[in-house]
Amino acid sequence: MATDGASCEPDLSRAPEDAAGAAAEAAKKEFDVDTLSKSELRMLLSVMEGELEARDLVIEALRARRREVFIQERYGRFNLNDPFLALQRDYEAGAGDKEKKPVCTNPLSILEAVMAHCKKMQERMSAQLAAAESRQKKLEMEKLQLQALEQEHKKLAARLEEERGKNKQVVLMLVKECKQLSGKVIEEAQKLEDIMAKLEEEKKKTNELEEELSTEKRRSTEMEAQMEKQLSEFDTEREQLRAKLNREEAHTTDLKEEIDKMKKMIEQLKRGSDSKPSLSLPRKTKDRCLVSISVGTEGTVTRSVACQTDLVTESADHMKKLPLTMPVKPSTGSPLVSANAKGSVCTSATMARPGIDRQPSHGDLIGASVPAFPPPSANRIEENGPSTGSTPDPTSSTPPLPSNAAPPTTQTPGIAPQNSQAPPIHSLHSPCANASLHPGLNPRIQAARFRFQGNANDPDQNGNTTQSPPSRDVSPTSRDNLVAKQLARNTVTQALSRFTSPQAGAPSRPGAPPTGDVGTHPPVGRTSLKTHGVARVDRGNPPPIPPKKPGLSQTPSPPHPQLKVIIDSSRASNTAAKVDNKTVASPPSSLPQGNRVINEENLPKSSSPQLPPKPSIDLTVAPAGCAVSALATSQVGAWPAATPGLNQPACSDSSLVIPTTIAFCSSINPVSASSCRPGASDSLLVTASGWSPSLTPLLMSGGPAPLAGRPTLLQQAAAQGNVTLLSMLLNEEGLDINYSCEDGHSALYSAAKNGHTDCVRLLLSAEAQVNAADKNGFTPLCAAAAQGHFECVELLIAYDANINHAADGGQTPLYLACKNGNKECIKLLLEAGTNRSVKTTDGWTPVHAAVDTGNVDSLKLLMYHRILARGNSFNEEGSESSVFDLDGGEESPEGISKPVVPADLINHANREGWTAAHIAASKGFKNCLEILCRHGGLEPERRDKCNRTVHDVATDDCKHLLENLNALKIPLRISVGEIEPSNYGSDDLECENTICALNIRKQTSWDDFSKAVSQALINHFQAISSDGWWSLEDVTCNNTTDSNIGLSARSIRSITLGNVPWSVGQSFTQSPWDFMRKNKAEHITVLLSGPQEGCLSSVTYASMIPLQMMQNYLRLVEQYHNVIFHGPEGSLQDYIVHQLALCLKHRQMTAGFSCEIVRAEVDAGFSKEQLLDLFISSACLIPVKQSPSKKKIIIILENLEKSSLSELLRDFLAPLENRSTESPCTFQKGNGMSECYYFHENCFLMGTIAKACLQGSDLLVQQHFRWVQLRWDGEPMQGLLQRFLRRKVVNKFKGQAPSPCDPVCKIVDWALSVWRQLNSCLARLGTPEALLGPKYFLSCPVVPGHAQVTVKWMSKLWNGVIAPRVQEAILSRASVKRQPGFGQTTAKRHPSQGQQAVVKAALSILLNKAVLHGCPLPRAELDQHTADFRGGSFPLSIVSSYNSCNKKKGESGAWRKVNTSPRRKSGRFSLPTWNKPDLSTEGMKNKTISQLNCNRNASLSKQKSLENDLSLTLNLDQRLSLGSDDEADLVKELQSMCSSKSESDISKIADSRDDIRMFDSSGNNRVLSATINNLRMPVSQKEVSPLSSHQTTECSNSKSKTELGVSRVKSFLPVPRSKVTQCSQNTKRSSSSSNTRQIEINNNSKEENWNLHKNEHLEKPNK
């Protein structure tokens, strides 16, 4: 083994050396690899791979033999028999590693060296090979690019040559145009110079006019000041005359007492001399009636001296005999109607004034002799009267009339031509007797209606007429003109009834057509023309032109006559019905044509001339509406110049006149073969078309072609749009126009596919099959819709093409139009009523198709375009604008209108489970996805077949959109800045109010945001100042920018977005959505302009006083310098004055003057000397020697009612009125020194008085000041509380106004009605001292869901404020006579028992009638709170039921005016202005009967115990009657208030007999029962009139001595019917003044005072 190992070692060591040597030699040579070819590189690569494989084999063999060789080499030479060698071996084994020496060379190291070298070579070779391959690829790519560039270079060179040629032509054309334009520029420059010269002249004229206008303004201001001064003088003179009148009346009263004494003496003498019985009760009644007539018709002095024995029977009988029906000159507006016709029937002519009647004229559409009654189903109600419907059979359409009304009269033919207006539906009948007031009317219309309606001479329900002489006549001839006046009143009443009477039938939307015209005429297409019941003509325009007259066409006439064809009547009618499916933008000039067409539709034959049948070709199919030569129309692709849209031929009498759309144009009508002459077609065609004979052979190719080739020629002509050839082919006999080629395309399909509208029209007129499908199932409509030829689509739809036809794949025309994004075609198909939910075989809907193409407009049309009702006129532009302006300046209609597609269609999934949202999100169509997300029914979490949602497949942008679907809702608040402290009456005014929440989307622009803020403010201002409960959505239709209180977007001072200031119209770099999120703006605050800016907008919003009135107050202060504000306590006088002072101060400071406000509170101890010191210290009073300063002083004197005005201001009146050094006044100071002073011109003096009116000596001050009266029943106080509480509710609901049925609205309305009813009752009781302003009710709590809180607050207000004031006023009235000099007199410190009972009765009545009445709480719950009210436990049996939830609209006109002497002038508080005539005869009947029975029962109550609470009150009346007349009058008034119904609800009560309490009396009450029966007769509403108080007081009649057990004389004479009606006329004639000063006392107060004086002084002698 050793020898073998030794022999093998050199061989093993030599092999690696040889390999290393070979590698070294190869390395030395190092041939260049880059120079090798591809084949050599491949060979080298194969050699290398072989060597690598051999190397691997060698390595494996060497590894296998390594161990064996190693062992043999190390241990092979040792033998066990040699110990020396063993020792040597052990020695080597025991030595260290460093000391060991290898016995032989290690082959492993040699092998590793070889392997390392081979690896290096392998890596180098692979790198070189990769570099070679990359270079080879680059080379090939560069070769290909070079070839492509060479080809492109050749193409570009060719194009360059072409473009050079074109550019040369363009340059030549531009040069010509430049020359032309330069000439035009010179002409325009000359024109401009002329215009500028004219403009300069106009400017000069304008400046002159402005100067004249300013001078006129100054003159008017001066004249106004003079007029105001004269008015103040007149007021003073009037007050003096009134005082004189009162003195005269007192003297008259004394004279009447003497007359009464003389009467009694005469009666005693008669009884002593004659034994005849006294006058019977009926005789007294008659005398009583005559007295009333004398009082009403004669003057003041005559009335004072009149007695009961004056006889004026002749005049009364004469008036009764006057005929009621008088001939009146007939007019076109109001023909005569029989005055004695029952039921108040109006003629068919509109009896209204031109200023009121805004109804369009329809007289030419309705026959003159046919009564125009609305059909029962025609329930259209418009604002001022509905349009007249069609004219069906009158016997079947006459509405049911009232039982007491005769059938309406028919308009005679003689009157018909005079009437240019059709009768409105609800002007045919006057309101019946029990018709109540329309709840939503203007108060002016209501007042005017009752002004002319409630007459005593009007016929009642039974047709009877009662007459009495007028109460007061202005002229001597008024008696003769009575009936004429009555007729005029009836006319105005009937005109007003159009606005006030309730409508018959349920109201429908104004745009709905009447349903009674179905079947009469086929509806015309939507060309802004309605049928007989819908056509409208504006007032003032001539009526529509009647049919069969020349000059009807709106299009120009052709230059030569055209050939016409007879239209088949059946096709005409069918086509007319088909036209209804589209909307057309029709100009107003098409109205007369539309009327003509409607009247001619049902004619059996056309009126066009009949020509030979063969050349029956009408080439007027060109859109221009005139004849086009055959040469112009025969060229392929030649489109003549046309206006947008399709126009009707000018002379076509047999077709619809639709200016912008051809509904049907029968220009070709195939004729039978028997009526054609062979061989005549060519020549006649040439003659008709205008060709020259030389062109005919070219077209006909030498003669007629065989029919076998004609269908192919027909296809070519239709596909190429050759109208002339197509018309020739269609006129040949035996030609199959429905022939289809190999692919199934017919001629109509080819024409529709290529958009040749004229060819389509020709083929359809030739009765080509409109629904013929090709081999794939596509019809011509499908082809036209897919290609976007909307005119062809319109024609095909008009010819009854199947709009829902589905091809073999399920594609409908709508699907194809959406797939190709053809907006106009989609719109036409939708208006035709196509089905949007048809699915294809793949489950795709049109919504999928629209979204797949990313067409936003198509998707919007599908989702939001509504299908209009047939026959209803609609403005196409309006509907289109409501669809497409989605992301424009205005808010998108998606925010205000709902999509028309259901949620199922939006969420429908196709075969893969993808919805439209999946497709939009996956393709990144963000706009389409956003539109889909606006649909409320979208399900974004719906998953497809792969369990993926829309968010899973969405792109990044769409994911962001889906993550931010919800828009930001930022509350918008209005701030009025700092409000002054509560001592100015502003403690209940709120600083900030939330009006709404703005929805800010990510796509919202700053312009949209500005418009949204402005619109929200305008809507809020309009909502809080409206008459009813509005929501912000209800106000959007209102286009007015100013509200009733005068606030608008111009009232804004600044706006802050969170804490960042912003102004309307300002834009930031970020969008509003990003801006709000980045700045974390939680609210938007709008600050209104206030006194600091010299404006009053914030004051208006804080106090709800209209801005115009505040500005008027400020103008009065600036103009007159001396202004006093007076009104009931709590009318915000102090707040108004202080805000006006602040505004005036800042205005003066802006003008450069220094200004100071000096405020002084006046109390009972405030003396004239203190006021003098105040004027001097504030530099208002300046010594004559001292020069005036430029400083402005504003002095405010508060609570002037606590002092005597005449004593406090007497010495200052003259110098205040004449402020100059020329009229000084000497004043004595406290130190005894006197000095001359005068008032500074720059001094403003304002005062406040918490008193409703001036009395006594205070009237002397009136003419020296400008007075502003804040009446509780007039603006601004009347609507202030309503607006304030409504704003409070809106703020509580965070800008969302609740519905009127909400409990919060009801409780707020109740609080408002409490204030109004309370003041009306207090005014009726004659206690103006107790009247309350709205300030106390501003703190009304608004707590949703807790109405009890408001009731508890009301109880605290009643106990703390209202009841003490009422008690003080009642005691001051029921105690001693009040002194005329000083406001309120103090009541007795220790009132008597009777006075206490009167106070309790008054509080109980006020509580039940004014406070608890109308409370929305349930009866059981309200009874629990009644005990909290002071005075609620006083027993009264006759009180108004307070469980009614009806809102009180106003109070009665029958106010109690109880002033019996000149010292009490409370009559001015007795006329509330919102709804005076709201009391019916029932109220009079209840009052009269109750008082008659009450007084009779009072005389019997001494022997009986108190049976009920009423008798208790009557005993109080009897007990108090022995003490004071005021107490007696007060108790009578309380009885009247108890016995009457609620004033607001009396007019709605038909008969309240059960509410009348009848008491047993003696047997001599026959006249009483007769009167009761007389009063219970049915009375029409025209007789319902406000009662003056003297009717009530006259009803408290006196008894005779034999019937009374007491010493006072009272009469039991009832008031006759004629007396009542006469009194109602007196009341109706009276009117309140509109002067801004104090409203004059009603004229009835004089007569009323006379009655009370008479009744009072009749009783004095018997005391």
UniProtKB/Swiss-Prot annotation:
InterPro entries: Ankyrin_rpt (IPR002110), Ankyrin_rpt-contain_sf (IPR036770), Cortactin-Actin_Reg (IPR050719), Cortactin-binding_p2_N (IPR019131). GO terms for molecular function: protein phosphatase 2A binding. Keywords: ANK repeat, Cell projection, Coiled coil, Cytoplasm, Methylation, Phosphoprotein, Repeat, Synapse. GO terms for cellular component: actin cytoskeleton; cell cortex; dendritic spine; FAR/SIN/STRIPAK complex. It is found in: Cytoplasm, Cell cortex; Cell projection, Dendritic spine. It comes from the Eukaryota. The keyword Metal-binding does not apply. Residues 119-276 form a coiled coil. Pfam families: AAA_lid_NAV1, Ank_2, CortBP2. Signal peptide: none annotated. Residues 384-396, 1624-1638 have a biased composition (Low complexity). The keyword Coiled coil applies. The modification Phosphoserine is found at residue 1524. Residues 1-23, 203-222, 352-440, 454-478, 498-616, 876-897, 1446-1485, 1580-1602, 1615-1663 are annotated as: Disordered. PROSITE patterns: ANK_REP_REGION, ANK_REPEAT. ANK repeats lie at residues 709-739, 743-772, 776-805, 809-838, 842-871, 912-942. Regulates the dendritic spine distribution of CTTN/cortactin in hippocampal neurons, and thus controls dendritic spinogenesis and dendritic spine maintenance. Associates with the striatin-interacting phosphatase and kinase (STRIPAK) core complex to regulate dendritic spine distribution of the STRIPAK complex in hippocampal neurons. This is Cortactin-binding protein 2. It comes from Nomascus leucogenys. The lineage of its organism: Eukaryota, Metazoa, Chordata, Craniata, Vertebrata.
